[in-house]
Amino acid sequence: MAVEDFEAVLKAKYPGKAHAKRVVDLIRKTKPDANGVIYLEGRMTKLLEDNDSPEHFRQRRYFYYLTGCNLADCSFAYDIQSSKSILFIPPIDPDDVIWSGLPLSIDEALSRYDVDEVKFTTEVNSTLAHLAKQSPNSTVFAIANQVSDSVTFLEFGSKDFETVKKAIEVSRVVKDEFEVAMIRKANHISSLAHKAVIERSKAAATEQELYATFLERCVSHAAPEMAYHPILAAGKAAATLHYVDNNAPLKGKQNLLIDAGCEWNNYASDITRTFPLTGTFTKESRDIYDIVLRMQKECTELIKGGMLWDDLHLHAHKVAIDGLLALGILKGDAKEILNARTSAAFFPHGLGHHLGMDTHDTGGNPNPNDPDKLFRYLRLRGHVPAGAVVTVEPGIYFCDFIIKPYLDDHVHSKYIDAAVLNKYWDVGGVRIEDNIHVTENGYVNLTTAIKEVSDVEAVSAK
């Protein structure tokens, strides 16, 4: 999809009403006679501790999914019987106007958001009471600990604080066209920022200079919010999976691993690239990069709706083992190495996860207590449906803290050639990550950041 294509999709309103209907359908799968009101609150303004300034605002994702509204201090009601949606926005506070200007009006909100009616938040209780009386013994569906003390549900026959949250989490797994366009736009901007970082790398002296370059490019494209704290790790720091210091000097380091992505209207991108700081990969870095790129490409090609993610993760380990055997870092029989789980010393994390409004989006069903260390940190388990967006992010790392216990354990050390391994410590780590839209019979790669060796070296050498 070209830039103009996803921009055309994004000219429409965020499809909050369609999402609400999907959520109701899911609620009725477990509660066929469900009737009443869905009530959700957005993020309320909260001051910093010991300060009179507000905390950085991040909208509640459950609320946003049904409204597309990114304003603070709002509420939402959806009448299940009539399919009527009502957005509540804060009334004008004259004392606040002098500082912040006029807030969105009711007419402006009705024009901007996919709702049937807009009211002020001062009308929440009276509106809920009216809706409750329309259907005797109706239920209000809300989320526990996300209802203001001033809101009352006394008129409803029953209260349910669990079902709607679970239904929204299930609904969020399969993305519609608008959501995919949001993720694609976030990817487009982030891919431009990744390229800008590579272009800047030869002139930069520290990680934070490249960090600033990434932020600048995203902000200049109207995407100031990061989906997560960016990782810019030079040299051996790349062996730390979630390195966040971003302040070390670049001199004398082989590569830089950058894991960074912006949001577009609350939808995330999550991209990782590794590139040479000298313009050309060293032999050892190229060895590892080629293995990781093969891991990523082969796993991506296996993606289609309904596939079991565990199988894909297992395939990534098989490719890693083959590559490390060819280099001599591993030795012995590939099947024995896999069964011993020795490859987890070099590829300790999961292959990927769901992506959406959260970087680690809903629906992953991880099992952190899995006795099998190969799957313990896999954030996505089970079959992946068509319509989901996932990350594919294999990596190979040389982390002394992780690898040393394997070298000290005969079960694993017999498969590792320490002399060959010693040549690769300075590589640090290599990870390559793209965002993939799963289709019925295949996939669409939403990430356009360069990753072929010839392209990466050509840009980094400039």
UniProtKB/Swiss-Prot annotation:
Keywords annotated in UniProt: Aminopeptidase, Hydrolase, Manganese, Metal-binding, Metalloprotease, Protease
Query: How does the cofactor bind to this protein, according to its record?
Result: Binds 2 manganese ions per subunit.
- Domain of life assignment: Eukaryota
InterPro entries of this UniProt entry? Aminopep_P_N, Creatin/AminoP/Spt16_N, Creatinase/aminopeptidase-like, Pept_M24, X-Pro_dipept-like
- Binding positions for Mn(2+) 1? D270, E393, E433
> From the record, what ranges are coiled-coil?
none
Reactions catalysed, as given in the entry: Release of any N-terminal amino acid, including proline, that is linked to proline, even from a dipeptide or tripeptide
Q: Which cofactor does it need?
A: Mn(2+)
Q: Member of which family?
A: Belongs to the peptidase M24B family.
Tell me what this protein is called.
Answer: Probable Xaa-Pro aminopeptidase pepP
* Source organism (scientific name): Metarhizium robertsii (strain ARSEF 23 / ATCC MYA-3075) (Metarhizium anisopliae (strain ARSEF 23))
Give the organism's phylogenetic lineage: Eukaryota, Fungi, Dikarya, Ascomycota, Pezizomycotina
